[in-house]
Amino acid sequence: MSDDKTSPMGLFKKYLTNRRIFKNREVLRHNYRPQILPHRKPQIDEIASILAPALTNETPSNILIYGKTGTGKTASVRYVGTELENASALAGTKCKIVHLNCEVIDTQYRVLAQIANGLDNADEHPSDSTRSHIPMTGWPTDQVYMELKNQLESSGGVMVIILDEIDKLVKKSGDDTLYNLTRINSDLKFAKVSIIGISNDLRFTDFLDPRVLSSLSEEEIVFPPYNAPQLCDILQQRAEMAFVEGALDETVIPLCAALAAQEHGDARRALDLLRVSGELADRENASGVAEKHVRMAQEKIETDSMVECISTLPTQSKAVLYAMLILEQMGKRIFTSGEVTVVYREIARIIDLDVLTHRRITDLISELNMLGVINTRVISRGRYGRTKEMWFDAATSKIEEVVTRDPRLDDERLKKLDVNRLRAMFR
Ligand SMILES: Nc1ncnc2c1ncn2[C@@H]1O[C@H](COP(=O)(O)OP(=O)(O)OP(=O)(O)O)[C@@H](O)[C@H]1O
């Protein structure tokens, strides 16, 4: 305490003096845009060849890009987009890229407004008083569409619209936006529009009108998952910029790569593992990052994502989960959906929740399984039909802590749950 008070940096001194691990941890963060993307040359070249006609003021084909999460789709498209803008500046042609994240911008109105406002660059058009800035709500959608067309026409040139996480837009607001955007070229004389849709969920195309799908997928590019040696190369390249020389034990990168490859070849996961391993070593003032830090990082990331996932569940799902925790506390390692339903009903009754049907509870159980919170399997019980069994994989103390953070489940009345009576019922 007195040390902290006497040092000018006080409490933070020890964090500033340990420079043995990181040189620049920012390069491991999600928002860092790498200049080199190992193992994505074929995809980058393909995107570039499809967009190249933009440099001679022709309309590039629309592209649909698929691939699992963390396979470098966004990073590659951004990279090609920047190169295209640079090349067009040199060639004296007009190409503009607008990148929208449809997880955030998920209605037709907002997509159209954002594209128009992306064009609405006052520096480029200082004397253009015909342009009006579209408010993010309030206008009729038709008016927004007209204004977008006007602005595209007055800008001229080629605009490439990147709709990242396009599946979220379709799920939230249907395919009207895509219908309008894929037809907009027929209404334009001086400008051209091309669309790149990016998704990690192939199923969204089932919800598209066949005409929209065929127009959107004039070209399709698939990003395969990375394997362990490829992830090693990606990590190696970032590690050189992020870590002090010699700070990483030689087993660290191969282990991060192997763990991320085992799951689904996700570069984001591999980079997170490497960054968190470094942070854990840094925090314990270690002289370097070792295998044990990677193991700790793996556990921390898993627990953090589980906590995040459970804390955002609705109260009914948490009540179902709470029923499973009670069954576990009663000494059961594996429980059936029938048992969960009995305990759940007791809980719902005590805390005045609407009591769900067995069918609905089974749906919530399947959802918990899909989220990886529990494991389930269906077993046949001969003439009694089939039933679902479930169990927890990991220690449940963290799950209980998160579930009981819900004010409805942190109820004094729940402490009166008659476990002995329940136990007798399952005998
Ligand atoms: N080949 C690569 N070289 C270097 N870094 C990469 C490479 N591929 C991906 N990354 C990095 O991994 C992270 C995830 O990549 P990106 O966001 O491009 O994935 P994505 O396929 O778009 O994922 P999602 O579908 O989840 O959005 C980013 O930090 C990115 O910089």
Swiss-Prot record:
Transmembrane segments: none
Residues that bind ATP: 71-75, 226, 238
BP terms from Gene Ontology: DNA replication
Keyword set, alphabetical order: ATP-binding, DNA replication, Nucleotide-binding
Cross-referenced InterPro entries: AAA+_ATPase (IPR003593), AAA_22 (IPR049945), Cdc6_C (IPR015163), Cdc6_lid (IPR055237), ORC1/CDC6 (IPR050311), Orc1/Cdc6_arc (IPR014277), P-loop_NTPase (IPR027417), WH-like_DNA-bd_sf (IPR036388)
UniProt key word Nucleotide-binding: yes
A GO molecular function held by the record: ATP hydrolysis activity
Family as reported in the entry's similarity comment: Belongs to the CDC6/cdc18 family.
PANTHER family for the chain: CELL DIVISION CONTROL PROTEIN 6-RELATED, ORC1-TYPE DNA REPLICATION PROTEIN
HAMAP family membership: ORC1_type_DNA_replic_protein
NCBIfam families the UniProt entry points to: orc1/cdc6 family replication initiation protein, PRK00411.1-3
Function according to Swiss-Prot or TrEMBL: Involved in regulation of DNA replication.
Name of the protein described by the UniProt record: ORC1-type DNA replication protein
